[in-house]
Amino acid sequence: MSVNNEYRNFPMVPRVVFGKGSFNQLTSILDLKRKKQAPFIFIVDDVFDQSGSIADKIELKYNDKLIYASSKEEPKTSQVDVLVKNILSEFSELPSGIIGIGGGSIMDLAKAVSLMLTNEGSAADYQGWDLIKTKSIYHVGIPTISGTGAEVSRTCVLSGPVRKLGINSDYTTFDQVVLDPLLLDGVSKNQWFYTGMDCFIHCVESLEGTFLNDFSQSYGEKAYELCLEVYLEDNNLTVEEKNGKLMMASWHGGMSIAYSQVGVAHAMSYGLGFVLGTKHGIGNCIVFNYLEDYYPEGVAIFKKMVKKHQIDIPKGICSNLSVEQMETMINVALSLEPLWENALGKDWKKIMTREKVRAMYLKM
């Protein structure tokens, strides 16, 4: 009997808790997953390395360990390798689990560490699609800023020695996610906007893509609607209500691309991130600002949002690149073939030449 594997059998987060104050349930959730006295490792954004922060609410037991990590730069394969090496050398047994508390960068870091604790070699060896062979250890995602969809995706995006690319696998997806809108309090306006626009751009690229299907469309349309409620419409939503809606927009946006793909903005943003270290959210905004030819309606709405919230989108960041830097940036962008195919179709290579990519980068 032949087996038809035409359709992807992709994983979803098996357990999620949502609600104000749900972070307080973390200890009881983890107690059920602890393997004797093997530690839980908490990887936490270092913005919380201060008194009175969420870190004070983390209950450490036995030899649990809290590691602060910076999100000022995109997570790197080398950073993952160091964390894994340190954990394996410090503990005689594998941890009970890894918990990532922060934005997309920290959650991606936690996912990558959970994978590399059970797979040999460097994280760079697994950048790509379905290269992971061994199941990760238990891992939990707790977003403190919403938009990236990292809490629900099957990838963890890393900058490596050659490229910026995710470890895409069925084992990457979190085993548990905690969605507490109260954790979004205190995010700066610019970061709130940039990260939320990552979600909006996910939706546009998914809904306008050639990979679109009913599954992706249903999630993408809901995320798009929620983004408009939060960022564009004049309504009487409280900050707390907006945080809850943005948290669900991020979730739905991530689900939308799980069964399709992103597009031009993400491909080119990866180039900016790899060469210039541009953070993902702001990188997407910089690129999307110039994509009227590909997403006219989406870009028009994006510009209204920028104006409404008085956000400054950086310009001229590619004006002083060396020839080598520009060529590397183009190489990274064009290497993301599934993204271009989703955006432009199977013949995308005839449409998106190196010179076109170069010309677009020079506008930024």
Predicted segment positions?
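Short alpha-helical scaffolding segments that buttress acidic/His motifs in well-ordered protein cores
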Residues: 200-204, 246-254, 268, 288, ...
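Glycine-rich phosphate/pyrophosphate-binding beta-alpha loops
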Residues: 147, 254-279, 284
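Catalytic phosphate/nucleotide-handling subdomain of diverse soluble enzymes
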Residues: 270-309
